[in-house]
Regions:
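Bacterial N-terminal signal peptides
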Residues: 7-17
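Bacterial Sec-dependent signal peptides at the C-terminal "C-region" and cleavage site
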Residues: 16-24
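Beta1/beta-strand and adjacent pyrophosphate-binding region of the FAD-binding site
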Residues: 24-35
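N-terminal Rossmann-fold NAD(P) dinucleotide-binding loop
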Residues: 38
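Aromatic pocket-lining residues of Rossmann-like dinucleotide-binding sites
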Residues: 45
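Conserved N-terminal/central alpha/beta ligand/cofactor-binding core
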Residues: 50-51, 56-142, 184, 192-194, ...
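Conserved beta-strand-loop-beta-strand element in the redox core of flavoprotein oxidoreductases
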Residues: 140-160
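Flavin (FAD/FMN)-binding glycine-rich loop and adjacent Rossmann-like elements that form
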Residues: 159-165, 169-549
Length: 549
């Protein structure tokens, strides 16, 4: 037999087998996510000469910082820049250097494209192995564990990732959830942790309509159904639990510059009746600095707005339209993103063109458009929503409202909440208040009513974030750290949900992972004195000198 005739066949079969073999990557420390905590965790591990792999479910790193949130909550009401040290401070200095190469101070207001540029350069400089568009598979068994330790996970495209210590840097807590770690979402009732604003907030005073807006399709007729954007459900009892989440939005950079502007046209399927709530609000005499138009009316024709935020009774937050997101499938999250994007596009078109909108508002909005030089692969639209609250781990320490307040707080039901004592294992400092946006737009006494907003500017203090809040219960997993979807109540998370806080916790998670790896310890057994000493040596701030409010 002439075996030479079979050689091409054998070579072809070998090639097919190689092509069918799934991609596999392994590292001592695996960081999963695209958020700021993912970046700082990976860089902290790399700068400690550790074998680290950074796996992102999407193409672009930075999370919402690289997707529209260009105005950071730093040195606004709180004067809270003091806790920003270590890699977090370095990151904001690196952003400043994309504007001024010689900058030595951090910059907290910037364009998203500059943040993305700074992140990509930083990761390349550290020679970190980066995998993009590698999302964990939703199929059962995609995360494998042995003896309480994660051994690896499989991505949607079949790529296999293995490691010794894992860090879940996603805001959504996907690796955490798929690993079987205890978590929750939505709003706990006040009774669960003895809080005063843990669940439904009734009455809601913040972000509330101060003009009566009729909620029914035929004004005054409940049988006619509700106008779009109003949920026909009861407000609920103060302090009761539910699965709501504060409203999401798109954080939009916008411009007036004709050479850089993408006009915002009506989306497919646009129907002006979907914005009846806005029409009635304006007709009743309502208004705010969001609806009046982006930026400053005196901005010149080259003006570029860094970040169109939403924190008003009526703006770009679509209360009640996101409740399926936190624990939803990837398909459900995509649907919610697309709904928010389409509705935002339609809203801008409505405010720019609809005859019911006051002429001065139409004139202002019609000058603005999306930016050609932002999100160039997505038509000028941010690639993600601003996720104010999703999943939250439930661990041995749950950060609650008591950790945030400086003085006793009282609730409508007569409960008085005492401040929690300082924690013994701080790995960073949170310096913000309980900051909850509305979660639902419902009906109360025959009028449109926003429920769920609570912002306490007057009773908060900087507080140490305990190491225990970023590690799971020992029975759940012993080699995972969770710096973004950390263990907290809904109210407690309201003081944690700042991007710079995530980045602080990411660095601390990276440092703890290195120690756990070097000492061959479960993350629950990392010696806190060793971790604290290391963090301080790296410029991390784990205590502050100021007392707060």
């Amino acid at each position: 037999m002439n075996h030479r005739h079979f050689q091409p066949v054998f070579a072809f079969l070998i090639t097919l087998a190689a092509a069918a073999e799934p991609e596999h990557h392994s590292a001592d420390i695996v960081v999963y996510g695209d958020s700021p905590s993912s970046i700082s965790a990976a860089i902290e591990a790399a700068e400690n000469n550790t074998d680290v792999l950074l796996v992102s479910p999407v193409r672009h790193f930075g999370g919402i910082i690289a997707n529209g949130l260009g105005s950071q909550d730093v040195d606004k009401r709180a004067g809270n820049a003091e806790p920003i040290g270590g890699l977090t401070r370095e990151f904001f200095i690196r952003i400043a250097r994309t504007y001024d190469h010689d900058a030595t101070s951090p910059r907290y207001k910037f364009h998203s494209s500059r943040a993305g540029q700074a992140i990509d350069h930083w990761l390349a400089e550290k020679n970190i192995l980066v995998l993009r568009n590698k999302r964990i598979s939703e199929k059962p068994g995609s995360v494998t564990k042995e003896g309480g330790c994660i051994t690896g996970f499989t991505c949607e495209d079949g790529t296999r990732i293995s490691g010794k210590v894992f860090i879940d840097g996603t805001i959504e807590g996907d690796l955490m959830a798929f690993s079987g770690v205890s978590y929750t979402w939505g709003r706990e009732g006040n009774d669960q942790y003895g809080e005063t604003v843990g669940g439904v907030i009734n009455p809601t005073l913040e972000q509330q309509f101060h003009f009566k807006v009729d909620p029914y399709n035929i004004p005054g007729d409940p049988s006619s159904g509700t106008i779009f954007g109003v949920q026909n459900e009861p407000v609920g009892t103060h302090g009761s639990a539910d699965k709501s989440a504060m409203g999401f939005c798109l954080r939009l950079p916008l411009t007036k510059d004709p050479e850089n502007k993408i006009p915002v046209t009506a989306p497919e399927g646009y129907n002006a009746r979907d914005y009846e709530l806005y029409r009635r609000f304006l007709a009743a005499g309502g208004g705010n600095d969001w609806l009046d138009g982006p930026g400053n009316k005196n901005d010149d024709r080259k003006a570029k707005l860094i970040d169109l935020g939403s924190w008003h009774e009526l703006s770009g937050n679509f209360y009640g339209r996101n409740h399926g997101y936190p624990d939803g499938t990837y398909a459900e999250r995509k649907r919610i993103y697309e709904e928010h994007r389409g509705y935002t596009q339609g809203l801008i078109h409505f405010l720019s063109t609809d005859p019911s909108v006051p002429v001065e508002i139409r004139a202002e909005w019609s000058q603005w458009g999306l930016c050609k030089d932002e999100f160039t692969d997505n038509g000028g639209w941010p690639r993600m929503l601003y996720l104010r609250s999703t999943r939250r781990m439930v661990s041995d320490y749950v950060i609650t409202e008591a950790d945030v307040i400086a003085r006793p707080a009282s609730s409508q039901c007569g409960r008085t909440l005492q401040p929690a004592p300082p924690v013994e294992d701080p790995i960073g400092v949170a310096w913000w208040f309980v900051d909850l946006h509305a979660a639902r737009t419902v009906i109360k006494e025959g009028r449109v009513y926003n429920e769920g907003a609570f912002i306490n500017y007057d009773n908060y203090a900087p507080f140490g974030i305990p190491y225990r809040s970023i590690i799971p219960k020992r029975a759940d997993c012993t080699n995972l750290l969770v710096p973004s979807a950390l263990s907290s109540s809904y109210a407690g998370y309201g003081a944690l949900r700042l991007e710079w806080t995530y980045m602080v916790l990411g660095q601390s998670a990276g440092a703890a992972a290195v120690i756990a790896l070097d000492k061959n310890l479960p993350v629950q057994d990392v010696p806190y004195p060793d971790l604290a000493a290391h963090l301080v040596s790296r410029g991390q701030k784990i205590t502050v000198s100021k007392a707060g409010n």
